[in-house]
Amino acid sequence: MLIALFALAHLPIFRKTPLSASSSPPPSVHRSPRCGKASTAYHPPPADACISITASAIDAASGMSNSAEQDKPIAANGNAAEPQEIEVIHFQAQEKQCCRVIRSNKTKVLTSGGVHTRGSSKVKLKNIVDYKWERKYYYPGHLVAVHRDGKHLAYAINVNNKATGMEGMVRVCNIATSMRALIKGMSGEVLDLQFAHTDCERILAVIDVSSLFVYKVDQIEGNLLCNLVLKVEDPIANYVPEYDMVSWCPYVCSSSATVPINDDDDENQLLIWSRSSQFQCFQVKMIVSEHGRGKIQPAALESGYLKIEEDSLITCAALSPDGTTVAAACADGLVRFYQIYLFDVRNHRCLHEWKPHDGKKVCSLFFLDNINKPVEESYWQHVITTSDANTEIKLWNCSLWKCLQTINVVASPSSLQPRNFIAGIDRSANYLVLSCLDSLAVYVMQIGSTGGADSENRSSDSEGEGCDTSKRIQNVAEFKLSSGILSFSIVNASMRRVKNSIESYYPIEEPDDFDDDSNSTSALVLHMFVVQAKSLQECQIIYQPCVAEKTERSSLNSKRSQTPEDNLLIKEEPESPNSGTVGAVQLDALFAKSAKRASTGSSSAMVAVAAAAAAAPSAILQDATKEAAKSESPQLSSAYTQQVNLMTPDAFSASGTAAAAAVFVSTSTTTSIGTDSSTTTSGQDRSIDSAVLQTIRMLATVTSKTSENPNAEVLLNLMNNTLIEDREQQKLKEKLDARKKFIAIDRNPERNVAENLASGSSSPSREVQEIMATQDDADAYEAELENLDDDDDDEEEELANSSPLPEAVDGTWPIVKLSSHSAELQNAAQIMSQAVQNTNNGNVPPTLGGGHNNNTSVGSNSNNNTATTLSTSNTSSSNNAGGTCVDSSGTGELNAKMELLIDLVKAQSKQINKLENEVNKLQKQQEAAAALHSKQDTSLEPKNLSQLAYKIEMQLSKLMEQYLKRYENEHKKKLTEFLAARESQNRELRDSVLQVLNQYVMNHFTDIIGNVLNMELQRQLLPRVNANMDQLQAQMQVEIVQKLSVFDKTVKENIAQVCKSKQFLDTFGKSVLIGVQTSLQTAFIESMSSTLIPAYEKSSQNMFKQLHDAFSVGIKDFMVQFNTYLQHMPQPQAGSGNTEEINNKLSMLKQLVESSLHKHRTELTDAMLETQREVKSLEILLARQVQETIRAELRKHMEAQNVAMRSQAATPAPPYDLRDSIKQLLMAGQINKAFHQALLANDLGLVEFTLRHTDSNQAFAPEGCRLEQKVLLSLIQQISADMTNHNELKQRYLNEALLAINMADPITREHAPKVLTELYRNCQQFIKNSPKNSQFSNVRLLMKAIITYRDQLK
């Protein structure tokens, strides 16, 4: 009762406030939106959501718009606020409120912690496919794509193939007919897939690492067929996919076009493929018409194709709906807009370039164009960009290239890891959806348009001024999930009629399911398909979005009409200045007869205001009448609507599961103010409580004697003036804060614990328990405060719309009616006390009369009827108070209480009908009496009237004080009893909760703790351990490498010192000599016996055989000649003459034999010398072979020794490189040895290497050639072996080598002819094959020199 007195003392009718002070509510007062209380740090003063009076009309009516208020900065949403302040929206983990209004241009959204174990009841999930996808935070594209019809679905899967490794596939299915098809042939993982935005055809684009596939999905004879239309192969070398994506053009033809929309338009089949630092545009229809279906290379395309290279990695790309512009965002933060022209692959132009996020990488880019229907405006006027893993969201105006709004999504302070979000937008571009794998939540942001009327209220620094319409993110909603989302695809999002229950909504699928009497309301239905770690699910999010109080109904209607599925609006009719008809009214506001929660404060607040109005002094009303008369002008006439929430008896009998739920009826009434108004509307737009209306009518009767009938109407209409209502409602709300604290005793913290232990699904028993529970939450109380203000306005509207009661004939009429009014005042006080009591008790308030009846004007009533109604209400209230505690096993008792409650409501309804009939009769009698009294002289002296009014006021005040004191004492008693009952109830509930909690902990604590520990170990401990292990491994590797390098250096130094010591060299030489001696002797003996001796024996044998043959043949010839000579010689004569002749001949024979012997001796000597020279050459060759053999053996032993020594140091032996050895020899000046080693390798590349690194002047010095003859011959042979690569260097060395040949050397004379013949043949081949070579003339000169040398060697 103290709260009621406090509220009565601060009502508007007890204060004399100037009219100018009520033109606007105080800027510090914040009204909570209909969806609930937002815990925000920034509270700009909202304008009334139902007032549509222009600023000029308000200035004319109030006359108080000063320059100080006009100069205040105004935010983009029309609110006076500091532009530098940032609005903070914090979603709590356990709160029920899911949607928050965004009022500022800079907003920070704090997400919940993501520690919940169950999802929101507003999210409906239906399992489609069970498949395990890899759980990772970022996929470059979409894992699932849905066609525009919402029936055909495609999702990517990976199959491990033993032959080819991981193979990507795409499953296409029709969820309506359960037909499926599988697409194969992708190399590696499927990176992205998208359906084209067409209605008739189903065209699917799929990309992998190096290829683009376009398939056409057809349904033929009950089978789903996927036919390949186009395959573009364009691999990039050494490319690792990071931001690969494919996107179709969301083409929408102009609304002014006369040709209907055709799915075969070229723009419908335009797609963009972005990857690495390039993106490619393909016109599929044009390419197929020119090149046919199948594989194609981009290089072969001359039209229908465009490729653009960027400077850095492309993170995202999007096509405008008109198909003429593509926007590409890069990793360096730049976004470029290109104009595309597909008939020329080299023709493209950059339209604009800008950095939307100050150089930060742009993650997503969305054009805010409704692709569901044509529009009048040009496209891509607004765009949304995101950065920082889609946590920073900016809304841009592309006409001015300025930012309209910025929203930062920040993880809650309890979160340890930053959030990585994935983003998507629906086809109407009205809803932006964000999801995070860690937070286990989905965030929906509603994007709306602000019309030209709002543009007047924008600030001068608003980025969207100058445009007729501007986009704005109006609210954000958070929905918890049981598991995170890897990828999603949105089907559509629209406002629909849904069936509502206590905690959730269900969409009405068929039109026959809906009727005006069904339990339904209008809500947003977001339909999409989501991919989770273990399944693919169909998801529906159903909720009622928040609307800021300043947002007008017209803007909401225009925004909601953008979706083609939403046809639940009534078009706005034009209003005349003096008309009182209702404007654009939403059907969800007119026919939403129920809400999901009970409100315990609306009826009680309404009764409190009505009872307070009963004590209004008439003098104050007269002052208000004079001020209202001053503001009358033709320019002031305007219509406004006021939406209120009233509690009806239907709330207690609507359904079985929610029998005691409080139900609101959203109505709209319109009042016209003007000078030409002479009559008021007699019909009522909604039902009014009889007791409240009687009290207000009594005030109207008291004040009717002081003025004429039109002035009384103006006085009553003044009560509905919104300029006064706003200020008074705000002050009343401030005073009711104390009441909020007083009612706070109704909070029961144990209820949240019980709810958390309950199942996530909705059950009838749980809903009944929540309905009949005694505690109240913060959302219901906020709704109570709103309804209190709205009911006050609506009661005054009823007073304004009702006709005034007739006056009394003489002065005794007020005295006769005084007792009746006293009884009515007593009844009003009882109702007010009962409302306060019910509010404190947390019960559903009693429903007053007239909850169902419309168009009814209730006059005065008899005391008996009023007492009967009040007794019924008290009985209902007591029954409700007795049934607040519902035991889990008391279902029968609950049903009995429900039936009793329904019976009481029926009885009350019957009594209300009777009262209405009696009121109608009384009204007719009063009208007749008024007609009779009007004929008589009704003039009363002003003095008697003022005295009468003063007496009535005094009596009413005294009676009110008496009744308030009496009911205050009763209320204290009842409150004491209630607190005792409440304490016992809390004690029982606490015991039951503890028992249930203990049992639950004993049964599930181990499993839950195990799961939580495993999850936390994987999420928290494992990454940190891995990071520390990686650091430790890196440190160990660095230390090991350092230590190994130091150890290697030390070992090398020690080995070098040991090898250089004389003792080691002596020991090593002895050991090598001992080890090699036997092998060398054996090799020497074998070489002598197998090579030298046989060759010498063979040559000697041949020589002696030739000598024997020569002597034998010579002697035989001599004997033959000698015999012949003897035969021809004459017979010897006797005497001395013959003897002398014989002696002469013998002497001649002797000389001849001696000469022959001398000749043969000379030849034999020459042969022996030749043999000796050959033996010497063989000795030289043998000695060299023995030296090489010894060196090879020594080298092998040295290498074996080095390997053994290095193996002890645990380091690998360095590879032996001939080029390094040759370089060392050349640097040491051992040119012959270097060439010898290079020629022994039989590697022409090594020979060329030696030629390049040797100075020819040093090798062929003037004092003599430093190369041996065998080295020269080998060099000539190997250089001439490959004349195809002959060059100047080789030619120079050939010339020098030929000049250095020593013809006297036996080795040269033996082998030079063969080498020169081969060189001559190769030169001939070179001249034949390369006649135009630069070395042609030099080779010819070389050939002449070869001929000269060959002649010398012959």
UniProtKB/Swiss-Prot annotation:
SUPFAM superfamilies in UniProt: WD40 repeat-like
Start-end of each WD repeat: 309-348, 363-406
Q: Where is the composition biased (Acidic residues)?
A: 788-799
Phosphotyrosine modification sites are Y1320
Look up the coiled coil feature and give its residue ranges. Answer: 765-803, 893-936, 969-1036, 1159-1188
Listed A to Z, the keywords are: Coiled coil, Cytoplasm, Phosphoprotein, Repeat, WD repeat
Q: Provide a GO CC annotation, any one.
A: P-body
- Name listed for the protein in its UniProt record: Enhancer of mRNA-decapping protein 4 homolog
Q: Per the record, where are the segments of Polar residues compositional bias?
A: 554-565
* Listed Gene3D superfamilies: 6.10.140.270, conserved c-terminal region of ge- 1, YVTN repeat-like/Quinoprotein amine dehydrogenase
Statement: the UniProt record of this protein carries the keyword Phosphoprotein = yes
Q: Which GO terms describe its biological process?
A: deadenylation-dependent decapping of nuclear-transcribed mRNA; deadenylation-independent decapping of nuclear-transcribed mRNA; miRNA-mediated post-transcriptional gene silencing; mRNA catabolic process; P-body assembly; pole plasm oskar mRNA localization
Q: Which InterPro entries does UniProt cross-reference here?
A: EDC4-like (IPR045152), EDC4_C (IPR049404), EDC4_C_sf (IPR044938), EDC4_WD40 (IPR032401), WD40/YVTN_repeat-like_dom_sf (IPR015943), WD40_repeat_dom_sf (IPR036322), WD40_rpt (IPR001680)
| Location(s) in or outside the cell | Cytoplasm, P-body
Q: In the UniProt record, what gene is named as encoding this protein?
A: Ge-1
Return the PANTHER family for the record: ENHANCER OF MRNA-DECAPPING PROTEIN 4 (PTHR15598:SF5)
Quaternary structure and partners: Homodimer. Interacts with Dcp1 and Dcp2. Interacts with Gyf.
Region Disordered: which residues? 18-38, 552-581, 788-811, 838-884
Question: Where on the chain is Phosphoserine found, per UniProt?
Answer: S32, S561, S576, S759, S762, S763, S1207
Entries under Pfam families matching the protein: EDC4_C (PF21289), Ge1_WD40 (PF16529)
Question: Which segments show compositional bias classed as Low complexity?
Answer: 853-884
Entry's family note:
Belongs to the WD repeat EDC4 family.
What is this protein's function per UniProt? In the process of mRNA degradation, seems to play a role in mRNA decapping. Required for silencing a subset of endogenous miRNA targets.
Q: Which residues carry this modification: Phosphothreonine?
A: T563, T581, T1211, T1317
